[in-house]
Amino acid sequence: MKINNVLTAKFIKRPNRFVAYVYLNNEEVKVHVPNTGRCREILIPDTTVVLREGTNPNRKTKYDLIAAYKNDKLINIDSQVPNAVVEEALKNKKIQPLVKFNNIKREQTFGNSRFDFKLWDDSNNKYYLEVKGVTLEDKGNCMFPDAPTERGTKHILELIEIKESHMGAGILFLVQLSGAKTFSPHKEMDKKFSEALTLAHKKGVDIFCYDCNVGEDYIEIKDPVEIIL
């Protein structure tokens, strides 16, 4: 996935979930952060960050803060990216367990939840897929969530309902960096989410995790990552 109109800056501070300040061309500039997670281990003062220039002249901020360097590793933090990357991967048959599904629709409802994807094959076998972006990483070990997520737990419980309704159901964790070794739920951050994910696995819901190739102006799905529940 190509990302246009990118440039680098230095991170200063993030006063709230939606706004940050950076040094750009020797000026302090207010930018939008397209990620409501905490990202505390990534957005550290003087860190080099990647900005994307917006195309809407009426927006309040000119730039989005979409990625940051953690040591020499670039981490994409844009919460809109995972669905786009996964859609591209589904269409290009890059997710091996799901290659039989030729039909793909975004943002489809089941029960009281809207899921990221509804897939079906030529025999009309249906499959609902939820995608979660992962940015929390330590020495190659990745975790989700980095903040409590009632909505995430609700999605998992409804994926179990889908599976029990004799349809396919899965959740895909997309690690928005390269070189991930393992993935596990962040039990200390959100015990209910972790318990729901373990229950879903026992009930037959598919759990996938992939990392990405990440550059300042691109991101694409890469390799499966070992899952530890």
Curated annotation (Swiss-Prot):
Gene3D superfamilies: 2.40.50.580, 3.40.1350.60
Top-rank lineage group of the source organism: Bacteria
Pfam family, one: SfsA_N
GO molecular function: DNA binding
NCBIfam families membership: sfsA
Similarity remark: Belongs to the SfsA family.
Annotated PANTHER family: SUGAR FERMENTATION STIMULATION PROTEIN A
Name of the protein in question: Sugar fermentation stimulation protein homolog
